[in-house]
Each structure stands twice: as C-alpha cells, then as structure tokens.
C-alpha cells in the first residue's frame, strides 16, 4: 500500500480548515519563500511571506477566481558576486494558494521585508424562505 502526503497541498488551501488542519500536522517541507498562514478567527486570515532583499515594485499579487498568486522578480545585480556563503535567496518565485469560496483579499502590505496578505471570509446572507399565497383561481389559463 502506498501513502501519499497531501499536507503540502492542503497548507495552501485557505478556508478549508478542518481538512487542512488534519493533514497539515503530518509534517511538510518548506519552499521558497518561507511563509506563514495565520488564522485570527473564523473569518480572518493572514498570509505572511519573508522576502528579504525584495522591493515592493518586485512583487505582484493576483486573484483569479479562487486562486491567489504571488510572484516576485528581484532586480538582478549588475555584476556577479563571489559568495563564501549564501544563505539568503534572492531569486524569482511564484506561489499560489487556493482559497475557499467566499474568501476575499482585504488588503496587502509590505513592511520590513515581510509581505502580509489579509483575507476575510464573507459568508453570504442565507436566502430567507418566501411565503407563497394560495389563491382559489388557477394560476395558468386553462
């Protein structure tokens, strides 16, 4: 029998908490750039990406349907450096997150190398039952 670890997929599905929490605890590898997904309450979430060395103009956030995409294209240095140790990555990246229905991006900020994307769940008002009056005459001409 083969086991598949779906937690790396589920951690990017925001708003699907019960299923995501069950699978996320199995352990997962990090990708570049490192990021956190924070849940403030049942309707408010925040994605934070650590982007040291990036500028605001290097970043692009796009929401298409339920897919939230974040792309970064850093400015390349004029001359190639010789590294003794390179622990900080400054490379182009593209991340995408699948949002649950009714999730919306409420704003984004870039402060001190951290990109914060705030999300809110807007539950639609339930459609109230409509009472239909019954008349004595037929509704259709027959």
From Swiss-Prot:
Domain sHSP: 26-137
Alphabetical keyword list: Chaperone, Cytoplasm, Stress response
GO biological process, one term: protein stabilization
Quaternary structure annotation from Swiss-Prot or TrEMBL: Homodimer. Forms homomultimers of about 100-150 subunits at optimal growth temperatures. Conformation changes to oligomers at high temperatures or high ionic concentrations. The decrease in size of the multimers is accompanied by an increase in chaperone activity.
Record family assignment: Belongs to the small heat shock protein (HSP20) family.
The organism's place on the tree of life at top rank: Bacteria
Classification of source organism: Bacteria, Pseudomonadati, Pseudomonadota, Gammaproteobacteria, Enterobacterales
One family name in Pfam for this protein: HSP20
Function recorded in the entry: Associates with aggregated proteins, together with IbpA, to stabilize and protect them from irreversible denaturation and extensive proteolysis during heat shock and oxidative stress. Aggregated proteins bound to the IbpAB complex are more efficiently refolded and reactivated by the ATP-dependent chaperone systems ClpB and DnaK/DnaJ/GrpE. Its activity is ATP-independent.
Gene: ibpB
Classification via CDD domains: ACD_IbpA-B_like
Name under which the protein is recorded: Small heat shock protein IbpB
Description of its domains: The N- and C-terminal flexible termini are involved in oligomerization and in the binding of non-native substrate proteins, and are essential for chaperone activity.
Subcellular location: Cytoplasm
CC per GO annotation: cytoplasm
Species per Swiss-Prot/TrEMBL record: Shigella boydii serotype 18 (strain CDC 3083-94 / BS512)
PROSITE patterns: SHSP (PS01031)
């Amino acid at each position: 029998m083969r086991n598949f670890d779906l937690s790396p997929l589920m951690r990017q599905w925001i708003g699907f908490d019960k299923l995501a929490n069950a699978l996320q605890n199995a352990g997962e590898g990090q990708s570049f750039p490192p990021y956190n997904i924070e849940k403030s309450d049942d309707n408010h979430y925040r994605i934070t990406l650590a982007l040291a060395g990036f500028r605001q103009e290097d970043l692009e956030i796009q929401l298409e349907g339920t897919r939230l995409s974040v792309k970064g294209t850093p400015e390349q240095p004029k001359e190639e450096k010789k590294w003794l140790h390179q622990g900080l990555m400054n490379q182009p990246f593209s991340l995408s997150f699948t949002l649950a229905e009714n999730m919306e991006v409420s704003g984004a900020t870039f402060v001190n190398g951290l990109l914060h994307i705030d999300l809110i769940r807007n539950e639609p008002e339930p459609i109230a039952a409509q009472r239909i009056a019954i008349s004595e005459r037929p509704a259709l001409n027959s």
